[in-house]
From Swiss-Prot:
One of its GO terms (biological process) is intracellular protein transmembrane transport. It is found in: Cell inner membrane; Cytoplasm. Its main location: membrane. It is an enzyme of class 7 (translocase). It comes from Acinetobacter baumannii (strain SDF). Belongs to the SecA family. The gene is secA. Zn(2+) binds at residues 896, 898, 907-908. This is Protein translocase subunit SecA. The keyword Metal-binding applies.
Length: 911
């Protein structure tokens, strides 16, 4: 109430932003006559002039009016398109690092050229990020003539690209590509063995197309580079026989002999006591569990992992809803777009369990070698912006997570689409029959095209079957027909066209009323001017007929969990002031209604005695549905926020490791760095046998001599030194042993020569760093999976995760140092001196291995069975405590316990 009153007096924040930007638009428009009078050569020459002015200290904000005017004039001449004023507002929004919400068909692609041009003047590169390769290639080729006319280079990145071509694409002024490829290149760049092999040149400025899809829908999908782990396919096959023998418990707190309880809101499964006992007996009969042993003993946690995955695969994942079978493989279906996602695999053994369930060949599980999330990939950009047709419903999340404001850009022409109220039916069959009847009614009234949005492949195929029975020609666009996606969407606005699309497959391609005559022309082998004129004339007639019939009719067969996805479907109609109609058809059996809408609504509708073919249209029901969607959106936001809290911990460690890697690659020699490692490792080793501040009687000198001989291959007469010099204390001993070890290292290093020694040092340091970082990522995965159980002990899981992960990280740093020193000392003393050619070959082999690593996306959308990793995690934590070599202060900014006077993060907290 108060907010609306204040908004009425002062205007909303969005209105104030638009008012400010319109003043800048007036400046741009005032320059148009002057810029239009320039010759092509003079117009192109403006780009080097702007670059020079920028290098002389003029800001991009100051250059904006003139640069936008130049870009608009160039677009008029090269592309035959002039930016509208609302597109100029959108361009300003993007330049200022905000999200521009612009309705479908209003020209987001053209709008993006303005901010691209202005920010490319800095010479630091602009990344334009899209959701798929098709859109990246399309937009790059569409805008290439404009940017090349203005003297800017343009590149496109894609998977399996030649390294030289990809490096050139990143060096271009403007680089197009998918979010996946940009993210994977970031990870690959941090696995290279020389700086010359890096492709990306820094994260300066990014424009994300369909920003809501990438930053919201994809936020929970980590990017992972992985290698295969041990094969356990036989276990998946054996345990796959257990879930069919189990039955669900009907109510969570009412024991009825069920073996597990399904929480559909949380999308998780929890076993009951009877379930545990039954599974244990089955495993005993299979010979996988010893008689009398507990399933949850520390030695059997691998079985828990497999049982958990098998039950989830059978209970929570349905074929043609969550995945399809294609060429003998399980292919995940994106719940937000309905597109298949080849190459992506569910994590924690779930994908293998689904393969076992479907009787397919089971692919080995993967071990993570490098990982990040889109949240943590995009946040380091100096400036980030985005454009979409639907972001306002997620504005709070965009602001809180990414610091991005959403500006709603007004339409060029008024929006006249007729959004009708939802119709709610008793069951799905009644709903589907009503949809078919509505399609027949529309067909009888005129030639209006119809787009039917479904939530699942299954629903699209049911409707397709009913349309066939009714004799209605139609096209189906779902995960099984994705190859024809662009063609189907291009003609979905043709007269009498009926198109079924799963969620918003085809997003990014406008549906033009009357069809797309240019797409038809492109299909002809040798089109003549007569063909072009004929197709264009036919389109003009079809376009007018469709307008007279009321434009595109949108029929939603189900409400999505997110209002944003529903708005995307509605947004396909009513583009650029065209007419259109939209309506959703729902049933009490829809997942959203059944799980979230509330018993009161369902009870009321059943009490009304509705028949299958009768519908209800009531404000209370519509409000209840919207409230249900808000609840789901809030829950998903909390999940993403929680994921970010944990991944922020990983991200800080990742940044330290990657920064250290860059330093190692940049140094010509690591001698000083390695010698400091020697001293730290010697200090830690000696402390194990000669405790700090202890008396001589407590010293284990013999053990120290044995450790030096066995671990480092060095014979040192420590006992003899002590007998010769009674004043030799612990500190002096550390210094003397370190000096001896380093002296031998220097001697051997001199024999090798500086160049060979430097290459070998870099090889050992990077090899150890990468190997232990990989193991650390696996340990962090285990920690993450079981940390929620600390809540039962009245501990804060988030704080516990920070503490435990820090201990693991510090332990890893100590182990890396020990490994490097051990490898260098033993290899430098025992093996022949490698030639520069051999070392170069060694590095080449490492790079080939890195390039061969499997890229994958892991999905974490479904929670595991409660408590499945407790014991293994406790064992892991104990192991970390036992192996820790350096004291750990509570804060990384605290003074280092070694007494150096440096902060811990700059001393022993640094590799």
């Amino acid at each position: 109430m108060l907010a609306s009153l204040i908004g009425g007096i002062f205007g909303t924040k969005n209105e104030r932003e638009l008012k400010r930007m319109r003043k800048i638009v007036e400046q741009i428009n005032a320059l148009e006559p002057t810029i239009s009078a320039l010759s092509d050569a003079d117009l192109s020459a403006k780009t080097p002039e702007f670059k020079q002015r920028y290098n002389n200290g003029e800001s991009l904000d100051k250059l904006l009016p003139e640069a936008f005017a130049v870009c608009r004039e160039a677009a008029k001449r090269v592309m035959g398109m002039r930016h509208y004023d609302v597109q100029l507002i959108g361009g300003i929004t993007l330049h200022e690092g905000k999200i521009a919400e612009m309705r479908t068909g209003e020209g987001k692609t053209l709008m993006g050229t303005l901010a691209c041009y202005l920010n490319a003047l800095s010479g630091e590169g602009v990344h334009v990020i899209t959701v798929n390769d098709y859109l990246a290639q399309r937009d790059a080729e569409l805008n290439r003539p404009l940017f090349e006319f203005l003297g800017l280079s343009i590149g496109t990145i894609y998977s399996m690209q030649e390294p030289a071509e990809k490096a050139a694409a990143y060096l271009a002024d403007i680089t197009y590509g998918t979010n996946n490829e940009f993210g994977f290149d970031y990870l690959r760049d941090n696995m290279v063995f020389s700086l010359a092999e890096k492709k990306q040149r820094g994260l300066h400025y990014a424009i994300i197309d369909e920003v809501d899809s990438i930053l919201i829908d994809e936020a929970r999908t980590p990017l992972i580079i992985s290698g295969q782990s041990e094969d356990s396919s036989h276990l998946y096959t054996a345990i796959n026989t257990i879930p069919p023998k189990l039955r669900p418990q009907k109510e969570e707190k009412v024991a009825d002999g069920g073996h597990f309880w399904i929480d559909e809101k949380q999308r998780s499964v929890e076993m009951t006591e009877i379930g545990y006992e039954t599974v244990e007996q089955e495993l005993i009969q299979m010979g996988l569990l010893a008689e009398g042993e507990s399933l949850y003993s520390a030695t059997n946690l691998n079985l828990v992992h497999h049982v958990s995955a098998a039950i989830r695969a059978h209970v929570l994942f349905q074929r043609d809803v969550h995945y399809i079978i294609h060429d003998g493989e399980v292919v995940i279906v994106d719940e937000h777009t309905g597109r298949t996602m080849p190459g992506r695999r569910w994590s924690e053994g779930l994908h293998q369990a689904v393969e076992a369930k479907e009787g397919l060949a089971i692919q080995p599980e993967n071990q993570t070698l490098a990982t990040t999330t889109f949240q943590n990939y995009f946040r380091p950009y100096k400036k980030l912006s985005g454009m979409t047709g639907t972001a306002d419903t997620e504005a709070a999340e965009m602001k809180e997570i990414y610091g991005l404001d959403v500006v709603i850009i007004p339409t060029h022409r008024p929006m006249i689409r007729n959004d009708q109220n939802d119709l709610i039916y008793l069951n799905r069959n009644g709903k589907y029959n009503a949809i078919i009847q509505e399609i027949m009614n529309i067909r009888q009234q005129g030639v209006a095209p119809i787009l039917i949005g479904t939530a699942t492949i299954e629903a699209s195929e049911i409707l397709s079957s009913k349309l066939k029975q009714a004799g209605i020609h139609h096209e189906v666009l779902n995960a099984k027909q994705h190859e024809r996606e662009a063609d189907i969407i291009a003609q979905a606005g043709s007269p009498n066209a009926v198109t079924i699309a799963t969620n918003m497959a085809g997003r990014g391609t406008d549906i033009i009323l009357g069809g797309n005559w240019k797409a038809k022309l492109a299909k002809l082998e040798n089109p003549t001017p007569e063909d072009e004129a004929r197709l264009k004339a036919q389109w003009e007639q079809d376009h007018e007929d469709v307008l007279q019939a009321g434009g595109l009719h949108i029929i939603g067969s189900e409400r999505h969990e997110s209002r944003r996805i529903d708005n995307q479907l509605r947004g396909r109609a009513g583009r650029q002031g065209d007419p259109g109609v939209s309506r959703f058809y729902l049933s009490l059996e829809d997942d959203l209604m059944r799980i979230f809408a509330g018993d009161r609504v369902v009870a009321m509708m059943r009490a009304m005695g509705l028949k299958e073919d009768e519908a209800i249209e009531h404000k209370m029901v519509s409000r209840s549905i919207e409230n249900a969607q808000r609840k789901v959106e809030a829950r998903n936001f909390d999940i993403r926020k929680n994921l970010l809290k944990y991944d922020d911990v990983n991200n800080e460690q990742r940044k330290i490791i990657y920064s250290q890697r860059d330093e190692i690659l940049a140094e010509n020699t690591l001698q000083e760095y390695v010698e400091e490692m020697h001293r730290e490792v010697m200090q830690a080793m000696i402390a194990n046998f000669i405790p700090p501040e202890s008396i001589h009687d407590q010293w284990d000198v013999e053990g120290l001599e044995n450790a030096l001989r066995i671990d480092l291959g060095i014979e040192l007469p420590v006992q003899e030194w002590l007998e010769q010099d009674r004043r030799l204390d612990e500190e002096g001993l550390v210094e003397r042993i370190s000096d001896e070890v380093i002296a031998r290292y220097r001697q051997r290093r001199a024999q090798m020569g500086d160049e060979s020694a430097a290459m070998l040092e870099r090889h050992f340091v990077l090899n150890s760093l990468d190997r232990h970082w990989k193991d650390h990522l696996a340990a962090m995965d285990y920690l993450r999976q079981g940390i929620h159980l600390r809540g039962y002990a009245q501990k804060n899981p988030e704080q516990e995760y920070k503490k435990e992960s820090f201990n693991l990280f510090v332990n890893m740093l100590g182990v890396i140092k020990t490994d490097v020193v051990t490898d260098l000392v033993t290899d430098l003393s025992r093996v022949h001196i490698p030639t520069p050619e051999e070392l170069a070959e060694m590095e080449a082999q490492q790079q080939q291995q890195a390039e061969a690593m499997k890229l994958s996306f892991e999905h974490d959308d479904v929670d595991g069975l409660t408590g499945e990793v407790t014991a293994s995690q406790e064992a892991l934590n104990e192991s970390a405590t036992e192996q820790q070599t350096f004291p750990v202060p509570e804060s990384r900014n605290a003074p280092c316990p070694c007494g150096s006077g440096l902060k811990y993060k700059q001393c022993h907290g640094k590799i």
